[in-house]
Amino acid sequence: MSLNKVQEKILADFAQKNKHWPKAQLDAALWQVKWQLTALPHQKEPEGGEYDTFLMLAGRGSGKTHTASHWIGIRAWQYPGTRWLVTAPTTNDIRATCFEGDSGLLNIIPHSLIKDYNKSLGEITLINGSLIQGIPASEPERYRGKQYHGAWFDELCAFEYNDDAYDGV
């Protein structure tokens, strides 16, 4: 999402006010402020109350991937040393859409916060020790024992082993 002039001013003022912060801390804060300024109403998670599922059911181009990348990326940053699962129907879906796509994690999370991207293992490690792991829904047995702190199920309706995938997490 592009910023309007008011949003640009808010970000510039925030950056100026906090320029003494370490780069990673400032980049993370600017990322989160920018997301709050630009997220559309249907892209914001529900307010208030505890919940264990946040479902975004919407059409093509509505920002589902963009929303999920921000949601899981911000949490992985806010909770150091945590483990997060990204799953989609195939390994290629994870790589091409969820990790490397235009709205994928590698284009959403500030580069200064990413320690490593292991393409062959499908893992993004943040500098705070959090791990975002991509495992295809076609291999739900690989979810077991990982004790993830949260998960992003992309294109859940296309999962071959829907129940096994959901139950495994």
Show where each model-derived region lies:
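Phosphate/NTP-binding elements of NTP-utilizing enzymes
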Residues: 2-169
